[in-house]
Amino acid sequence: MRFFPWGFWLLCVASAPARGDSGSKARSCAEVRQLYGAKGFSLNGVPQAEISGEHLRICPQGYTCCTSEMEENFANKSRSEFEAMMKEAGRSVQTILTAQYKSFDNYFQDLLNKSEKALYDTFPSLYGDLYTQNMKVFKDLYSELRRYYRGSNINLEEALNEFWTRLLERLFKLMNAQYHITDEYLDCMVKHAEQHKPFGEVPRDLKVKATRAFIVARSYAQGFLVGSDVVKKVSQVSLSHECTRAVMKLMYCPHCRGMASVKPCSNYCLNVVKGCLANQADLNTEWKYLMDALVAVADRIDGPYNVDTVIGTIHMRISEAISNLQENKVSITAKVFQGCGNPKVSMKGSSSEDKKRRGKVTLEAKSSAVALEMLVLDAKGNLTALKSYWVTLPGVLCSKKIMASPAEDDKCWNGMTKGSYLPEVMGGGLANQINNPEVEVDITKPDMTIRQQIMQLKIMTNRLGNANIGNDVDFQDASDDMSGSGSGDSCPDDVCVKRLSKSPSTRQPETHAIPKQSGHGVIGASSRSLPSAFLLFLSGASIVVQHLWR
């Protein structure tokens, strides 16, 4: 009986905070209801005023306007919205790279088309039968050049050698129509004639210049396509389970807490996004190498390899070669007859060499060097601007898409309440996320889709490096099928269920300007937790009091 007054007093003290808290008025959930409905969800079951938040699995468990279903729906929504942000950012880069590809491709194809058209327009009047009876040889040449540019596995030097051989055979036969020339005789003729350069220096000179020009042109065009394709595939990588939780907490938990107008802290947002885009940031090094390689090749295109002059004058070089053959016809024929013997005279009559063509006729080629210069300048500017895309992406998403608060703001959403955000900002890349306070990142398991794209960047950069020094490289079509990654499941249990290793309750006290929590909120929730604490205190105090009264 002596214990009763002490026990009664302690019970009164323990129950006092609870009675005081019950008198406070819960805040309205009107803002959250409006947002929830605007996102396309039904308002059935949505609280009118704050409720107890012990059921929450992602957001802090204080008073809340969100039910379990709302939290799950918001988690799904945050994931889809974040992935949409990534795709939108990626599309802007794809648009730039694709536009550069199309600009150069149109320019290059136009050069080739104009050269071919000039040949078709002028050669009939210049060479008569020498051209009209051998049109297919010229068409095949331009067809092979286009196929090479498009990435077909063609040896360009062999294709050019084949063209000159076929042209020599056809022209020699046509210029010596009075003779019966067999295929065996043509084989012998080619061996002897080539020793005496029937076309002059044109074949060798054109082979060197055209090969270099086509190598850099197709590598340059392909580089833009590969870059665009890499961005497209990386932008489609699904958000991980851990990131879905972190992004939900960043974007929608303040609404659940009744802080709809409070923006996320800038550094808090950066840590979330850097953790979620850790694998993407690892593209940075190879991405910069690709951009630099494209700039270097652009300088070659508008410089030493002079694509405009070489490609735009192919028809003129062919005309020059034919002129050389006509001028050297007598000596070349004599040397061939000497080495291969005199062919039999044909019953068809004398040579059908066209009388229209005597002497050299100068063909004109309209230069588009200014257009190429402007095209290259524009490309170099865009490539330089895109070099830092992957490292600046988190900042861009936070400032322009998520609309995070300025870094100096100390009244922003820090993941638990309104206040300052104290943790340092993590570096970019997978290895730097080992201590990320917002996202649990397994740095031992890199994303394989992104690793494959890093390899694609390396391969393309190597091709551009070879092209830059005039080396031909094997090519493959970069427009392979899109490969999706991940499923579209909505907030699985292992996403919404609290993680043991990095839940809100494991935050260090210095992380935010609030005390450490174990699933409880800050406003109102702390007072509701006091009875439990006092009852624990009561148990211990009772033992002490009983001991003192003995």
From Swiss-Prot:
Q: What is this protein called?
A: Glypican-1
Q: Which organism is it from?
A: Gallus gallus
Instruction: Reply yes or no: does the keyword Cell membrane apply.
Output: yes
Regions crossing the membrane: none
Cystine bridges: which residues? 29-65, 59-253, 66-256, 188-340, 243-276, 265-412, 269-398
**One Gene Ontology term from the biological process aspect of the record:** positive regulation of skeletal muscle satellite cell differentiation
Q: What's this chain's function? A: Cell surface proteoglycan that bears heparan sulfate. Modulates Wnt-signaling pathway.
Provide one Gene Ontology cellular component: cell surface
- Source organism superkingdom: Eukaryota
